[in-house]
């Protein structure tokens, strides 16, 4: 038995199916199987909230968690996608723990951050970008705070994280080295030659898909209100640079750089880079918070009521096919017909 990704995301759905359906017959088979996926998605929202509450403020944290939870594509995948939702949640956990490592500088934070990477790696190989983000962020902090920065507090992370990841990997696979090679090879070629349609043009995954595919798809599948606040937040982060600002920017942009390599496969819209929806929501929340800081209390409440009511209505209109959501830039799902894939898992 072999899989081109870590086994951790497969265990909870199967266990839930065996317990809640086979053993006690409490739920239909599909519902029992999907409950852990929903929990993963909710945990991802909760992690984003806690992280931003500690790093920025509670209001921004609340805005971000609502943006994420009411993003149609995330909401849809949360009910069906057993790989990419757990991967996104684990990615968020790692970003929060890296932030805690830098801010608290304790041995326990170092160990927990390394263990979190092990868990993320054993969910999906997308997690290889976590230490890349960590390295870039630590380098920034070193350059900006050379006098107070102590490399000995952070360098061990880059040794412990891969060691812990491989030890956990070893537990699950009889041929851990061969399986590791299989995972990395599949990361690049697992979707080769699958047809991909983008704006009415046909491409082949792993060879001809353009580098801008992820950015294009994020623009057309993110609700316009979130997209607008994201742009405001992006400008705010660039104007007011702080360590947490750099971390959010790295979290959003670095994982997408892999698509500059034409041989990296991508299909099914945003699901292969779902981890960037969390920093996108965070940056949008910063933009909303920034806008509200200029508004009177009454106007601020009206803005919030309009924004979140619109998102909630969108979720309701598309239910249960939120995976097929496209925004007004392409004319919604109707305008996307013949130009984009409208369905994959669960639709």
Model-derived segments and spans:
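Loop-to-helix entry region of an early transmembrane alpha helix in multi-pass inner-membrane enzymes
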Residues: 3, 7-11, 22-46, 65, ...
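Short acidic/glycine- and proline-prone juxtamembrane loop motifs at membrane-interface regions
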Residues: 73, 79-86
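Membrane-interface alpha helices of multi-pass inner-membrane proteins
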Residues: 64-65, 109-124, 217, 256
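Hydrophobic/aromatic-rich transmembrane helices and adjacent perimembrane loops
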Residues: 84-87, 120, 129, 217-224, ...
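Membrane-interface transmembrane helices that cradle and orient dolichyl/undecaprenyl
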Residues: 94-110, 240
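Transmembrane-lumen/periplasm boundary regions of multi-pass, lipid-linked membrane glycan transferases
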Residues: 5, 11-12, 119, 135-262, ...
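Transmembrane-helix motifs of polytopic, lipid-linked glycan transferases
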Residues: 35-55, 93-97
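Short helix- or helix-capping micro-motifs
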Residues: 64-69, 76, 92, 96, ...
